[in-house]
């Protein structure tokens, strides 16, 4: 109550932000008359003038008003479109590391030209990021004339471009592309073997369209570059045959049913667990098929891989449904995006789940892959110096944007008042009653000539409605993951008189629904249309538009509430664009998944008290509130999953940044001769320490073992025992120096034989290849560590802290092994000439050609730390290690005598 009172007096934070920005809008408007008088050449010359001022030390903020006025005037001349004041406000929000919530149809694409132009003036590059290739190409081509008029270059970064084409795209002032492609290019650049192979410049400014889709819906999807691992398809097929023998435990909360079933499903958490009886049954089935030894347990350490396959198969059969979570097309299992309803070809579930679904559907099982490089979108986008985004629905996720990315959300007002009528939800007892009511509503709308957009949450539901409409002889179009090739065409005409369009989650479709249909597309369909044809098309459209407005505008009809309020708001936002008439209503039933899982008891109780009859609906604010609370619960859980993913990935991210920074340093260096000299002393000394412990008596020395090891690993055949027998004054330190000097002399001899330039090139190639191989193994070790870390909770240990501690130890091991392996390879390999180095490089390129890009959707329980989710939610905490923390300037614990930052704290 007091909060509302204070807001009335002082205004909301959003109002205060907009009020501050309005002063700059007034400045831009004041400049408009002067800029209208400029010739085209004078207007174009503004770009060079701004760049000179920036070079002289001016800030972007100081030239913002003039730059925005320049873009507005150029847009009037090139597009005959003038930026509204609210678009100027949106542009300023986007320049200030914030997220602009702008309603559908408010011209987000045109708004983006303002901050894109301003930030491109620095010459550091601007990345405008969209959700798919079609939108990236469309927006780039639409805005290219404006930017080129102002003397800026535009690039498009999409899948399938060659290296030079990608370089050209990134070297442009403004680069349009998809989030996936920018992320993969970052990973590929950090796997390059020469600076010439890199395509990206340092990451400066990212402007993300549909920012909620990319930074929230995609946050659990790591980008992975992978190579094929061993084939285990036979095992998936065998395990798949076990699952139909298992029985679900129906009433997991009832004591009388405990132990009756083989597995239980937790629908809220989207998890499945074996019961004690189920575990025994699976073990017996595995023993019968000869896959498990008699008396052996599925949960023993030796059978972890088998347990992994059984769990994946159970999840595939019980939690993943065909035509809801995936479709089968041309013998392939293709994931369906739960948020947009789009198919995602090329994307695969991780943890062996995709192979288990392939086995379930009887299609070809593709090999599991080994991770070579990976990053989450959360950590990729935090690499940018400046980050901003725009969407029609950000306010419900404002806390997450601020908490994870440090981005405030500003709701930008609409240019015209919104007049869409959002009606209360109607709740029915059964799904059948709900569908009958939906059909009746559609018929009523068609009689009035009002277009209807029906939003469904799954392909299965959209096909069910389509069958009902065929039965009722209602003409309609279906837009879902199976038919999105016709997407733009269907959406463009969804606003025609009496049109009925069924769409699986409309989020991110990228094409506005224009009342009366899209006249631009009609003109584009004609070859060389005459002025008369254009005028006729526009006049016909105006007539249709007026008829649709009179009928009430576009009617949005939701068939089920989504888990996220934001997705529901996106569906509603398709109507009422730019002040158009429109309406929306959601039809629900007690059989809907959200209602069944989260809101059933309370709402069912209300309905029974009201004595509802068949076909009767309940419409009450209490019900709407109960549903909204259910959605909040799901949103909170999903936020916790994303937050925990980030906390785990932050550990890997710190290591990734160290490795990538060091790798780039090595690659950019003309020679790494000094690095090799530094690590050779460490490596040889560490080997000597194993056989001649420091400050030990000679009786404890294992000289034969040392001689053998030096010969096997470093090709050093040294008569150490002979030296000791002949030279009484030879002690531990002088012996150590002689062995290290012997290695240096042997290496110098190799250098004289092949030539310094060839050896320098070979050193770099060995260092990079060894680092890449060990990094790949390290990522696999980190994966295995993460998958089992939740079990530490049973030992009263904090799984997150244990993960941080053990991953640090793994990283220490990586650095130590890297040094040893590099010196060992350089010692053993005989390089004869430049051709040997070139052959090594050719083999590497051949291997590179085999790697593939995967988008792997991380499973929830893999992220939150185990089946029971017992690991408590916590804020990101500092890394805890056993013993004292090693400071960067402290002596390295390895005993080298050097500072930690110059030894194990760095690769060299």
Swiss-Prot record:
Entry's Gene Ontology molecular function annotations: ATP binding; metal ion binding; protein-exporting ATPase activity
GO CC, one annotated term: cell envelope Sec protein transport complex
Cofactors demanded by this protein: Zn(2+)
Localization terms from the record: Cell inner membrane; Cytoplasm
Binding site for ATP: 87, 105-109, 512
Pfam families (alphabetical): P-loop_SecA, SEC-C, SecA_DEAD, SecA_PP_bind, SecA_SW
Co-factor remark: May bind 1 zinc ion per subunit.
Segments of skewed composition (Basic and acidic residues): 879-888
Leading EC class: translocase
Catalysed reactions, semicolon-separated: ATP + H2O + cellular proteinSide 1 = ADP + phosphate + cellular proteinSide 2
Recorded topology in the membrane: Peripheral membrane protein
Annotated positions binding Zn(2+): 892, 894, 903-904
SMART domains recorded: SecA_DEAD, SecA_PP_bind
Bias kind Basic residues: ranges: 898-908
Enzyme Commission number(s): 7.4.2.8
Primary site of residence: membrane
Region span, Disordered: 865-908
Residue intervals passing through the bilayer: none
GO-annotated biological processes: intracellular protein transmembrane transport; protein import; protein targeting; protein transport by the Sec complex
Subunit structure: Monomer and homodimer. Part of the essential Sec protein translocation apparatus which comprises SecA, SecYEG and auxiliary proteins SecDF-YajC and YidC.
Family to which the UniProt record says this protein belongs: Belongs to the SecA family.
PANTHER family with a match to the protein in the record: CHLOROPLAST PROTEIN-TRANSPORTING ATPASE, SECA INNER MEMBRANE COMPONENT OF SEC PROTEIN SECRETION SYSTEM
Biological function: Part of the Sec protein translocase complex. Interacts with the SecYEG preprotein conducting channel. Has a central role in coupling the hydrolysis of ATP to the transfer of proteins into and across the cell membrane, serving both as a receptor for the preprotein-SecB complex and as an ATP-driven molecular motor driving the stepwise translocation of polypeptide chains across the membrane.
Protein name: Protein translocase subunit SecA
